[in-house]
């Protein structure tokens, strides 16, 4: 048997072969649906839930954290707890693991309570100073999951890829998510939607204007902008980590 290769035909074929319903299952109605479970999405969902909103956080991977998860292994960067907004970043600090940049911060102000806590952790676990491509434990996937899983008003949907949006005029009223393991589809309804996918996936599906690449110097006046616009974007790194186990192991 040769399966079809057209998108719509293949979708129907898969649905029939898996015995899935034709219409998506109702996942509920929310005040806010956050799509994307990286650091931005996690912080957005946590903040809204703590302010009393009923929130759904949809993440297409089995772990949270995005780049700052054990799947990708990019360390958190950026200064927080700085004047004139010393509380800006508290949620990131609560959610994220202690790492390289925390060490740098702590050395700048070694007398503060926060700095002493950071130095104590890094003294006990020196491997945490490895910024990128460190051991899986550096990225504390379990900490992120526990924080969001146990948050009141927050509903977590892992392994779910948003594949479509429904609109009323120019307003998004629902998104369709597909479980990447079972193939089953769900519909999420809400008053507000936050696109934290990192690639603007929800905006694209909704038909929003978008642009890729670099603007020209004539448009922006930026001294380092190219003379003409182009399609260059930031690169992506594939992080990896290896250790000598002194035993033969399967890859």
Spans of features found by a protein language model:
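Conserved N-terminal/central alpha/beta ligand/cofactor-binding core
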Residues: 2-11, 21, 27, 47, ...
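Glycine-rich loop(s) and the adjacent beta-strand/alpha-helix scaffold that form part
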Residues: 192-250
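Short acidic, glycine/serine/threonine-rich loops at helix termini
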Residues: 68-70, 168, 205-207, 251
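Core beta-strand elements of the Rossmann-like FAD/NAD(P) dinucleotide-binding domain
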Residues: 28-30, 182-192
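Beta1/beta-strand and adjacent pyrophosphate-binding region of the FAD-binding site
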Residues: 24-38
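N-terminal Rossmann-fold NAD(P) dinucleotide-binding loop
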Residues: 41
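Conserved beta-strand-loop-beta-strand element in the redox core of flavoprotein oxidoreductases
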Residues: 166-187
């Amino acid at each position: 048997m040769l399966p079809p290769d057209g998108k719509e035909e293949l979708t129907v074929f898969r649905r029939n072969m898996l015995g899935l319903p034709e219409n998506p299952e109702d996942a509920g109605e929310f005040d806010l649906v956050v799509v994307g479970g990286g650091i931005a999405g996690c912080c957005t969902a946590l903040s809204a839930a703590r302010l009393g909103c009923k929130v759904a956080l949809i993440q297409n991977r089995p772990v949270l954290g995005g780049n700052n998860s054990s799947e990708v292994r990019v360390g958190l960067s950026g200064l927080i707890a700085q004047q004139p907004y010393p509380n800006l970043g508290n949620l990131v600090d609560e959610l994220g693991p202690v790492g390289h940049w925390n060490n740098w911060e702590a050395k700048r102000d070694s007398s503060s309570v926060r700095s002493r806590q950071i130095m104590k952790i890094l003294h006990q676990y020196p491997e945490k100073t490895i910024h990128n491509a460190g051991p899986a434990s550096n990225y504390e996937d379990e900490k992120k999951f526990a924080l969001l899983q146990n948050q009141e008003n927050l509903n977590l949907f892992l392994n779910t890829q948003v594949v479509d949006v429904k609109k009323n005029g120019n307003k998004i009223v629902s998104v369709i998510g597909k479980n990447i393991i079972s193939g089953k589809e769900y519909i999420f309804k809400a008053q507000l939607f936050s696109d934290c996918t990192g690639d603007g996936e929800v905006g694209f599906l909704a038909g929003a204007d978008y642009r890729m690449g670099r603007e020209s110097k004539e448009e922006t006046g930026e001294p380092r902008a190219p003379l003409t616009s182009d399609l260059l974007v930031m690169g992506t790194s594939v992080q990896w980590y290896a250790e000598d186990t002194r035993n033969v192991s399967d890859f």
